Amino acid sequence: FTLWFGGNIAPLPIVTGALGVQLFHLNLIWGIVAILVGHLVGGVLMALHSAQGPQMGIPQMIQSRAQFGTLGALLVVVIAGVMYIGFFASNIVLAGKSLHGVVDTVPVPVGIVIGALGSGIIGIIGYRFIHVLNRIGTWVLGIGIVVGFGYIFTHVQSDDFLTRGSFNLAGWLATVSLAALWQIAFAPYVSDYSRYLPADVKVSSTFWSTYLGSAPVSYTHL
């Protein structure tokens, strides 16, 4: 649970969620509904992949050989690799901008480098360290999210905050797709974490721990 909760508390989900209003011109209510539907549906596919981990004990990309064959799986690996390079780049750029916003003496490019180095070090240290950081982040950043929501709703400066924008089917479906894809994008590697669980762990336990840690939580951040 904390792995996916902590991993989804970041600037990128917030920026992504804002697209429903900023890019697709939905109002707040329809934007929330679209994001909720997308995450709850997309999260099912993501959590089902996670549930395979303890049962099979191998990385998700290796599992794809059963469906696509050895050569066909290489295409899946390449597509996933390109996707995660973009995901990593987006995160470190926002990390650099966030760091600059907190400490304005740190230039954005330097902040980006710091974010990249920090991510690399965490990855090198490994799996257990990632779990420790996410357990801490769940509490620290979770409290920060609650405080942030409280500040936003008590310091709204615009009279049309709740009514700005309107429903349009194309924008609503695009926002649903965006939210669903946020969850589905984890599927190519989600079982890389759950495969370390005992083989006799219940499938339902793995599914719900992943689903509840990612889908509803990502929804609140977006």
Segments predicted by a language model, with ranges:
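Membrane-interface "cap" regions at the ends of multi-pass membrane proteins
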Residues: 1-30, 171-176, 195-205
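Helix-loop junctions at the membrane interface of multi-pass solute transporters
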Residues: 19, 63-66, 179-207
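Membrane-water interface regions at transmembrane-helix termini and the short interhelical loops
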Residues: 22-25, 94-102, 116-137, 195-198
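Hydrophobic transmembrane alpha-helices that form the core helical bundles
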Residues: 73-105, 116
